Amino acid sequence: MLQTEMKVIQQTEIADKVYELILSGECVMDMSPGQFLMLKPSRSDLLMRRPISICSYDKSAQTCILLYRVEGDGTEDFSKLSSDDTIDVLGPLGKGFDIDRTPEPKTALLIGGGIGVPPMYQLGKELAGKGVQVTFVNGFQSAKDSFYEKEMTKYGTVHIATVDGTLGTQGFVTDITKNFLEEPDVIYSCGPKAMLEAVKASFPETKTYLSLEERMACGIGACYACVCPKADDRNKQFKVCEDGPVFRADEVSL
């Protein structure tokens, strides 16, 4: 974990209120799939950092890409960043996806919903690099909300579901996965709680890994703002920012 200043290389709106932010900094060298950064808004009245998942990184260039949706004052502040600006960053944080499983999977299903899609990109890239056959299933509300379909096709097969049917299959991600004839060796998912519950119920929990989207304040496990009940004892809790955000499905109670 490192508090540092990162330089803005470029920022582009790539979907409705969804921005692609490219940053440069030495902390990229410590990144792994499924981790996140805590970004500090520039406005003095916005005291809390905002957690943004890491979409991808290039360690040789020391750059990373963050994708986020403008949903409040903090992310609205980030959307005003432009080339050569700097931003105060804490991270990389959290325990991400374990891609060094034994035995090594031959097939992997990556399910993302909305702003839970970004961390699936780097994960899929690294799995494909290890020879794993990757299938992406991405869910959005509408075609205007979709992003990174073309980028993901470089590393696997991509399926899209939209609630209004304007792109791909009408419905939810599980309306696609329920028609798959073969069960993958491992399942990874990130997205809204309702989607994660559906994924958890659809596949064997011992080979399903969920990245939880909880509101965070500190990002380092000090404030207990992002807790999640443990599956074996709901009176005990995980701190999502420190113990996760990635958990095996049978470890957590959603």
From Swiss-Prot:
GO terms for molecular function: 2 iron, 2 sulfur cluster binding; electron transfer activity; flavin adenine dinucleotide binding; metal ion binding; oxidoreductase activity. Keywords: 2Fe-2S, Electron transport, FAD, Flavoprotein, Iron, Iron-sulfur, Metal-binding, Pyrimidine biosynthesis, Transport. [2Fe-2S] cluster binds at C218, C223, C226, C241. Binds 1 [2Fe-2S] cluster per subunit. Transmembrane segments: none annotated. It comes from the Bacteria. Heterotetramer of 2 PyrK and 2 PyrD type B subunits. This is Dihydroorotate dehydrogenase B (NAD(+)), electron transfer subunit. It comes from Listeria welshimeri serovar 6b (strain ATCC 35897 / DSM 20650 / CCUG 15529 / CIP 8149 / NCTC 11857 / SLCC 5334 / V8).
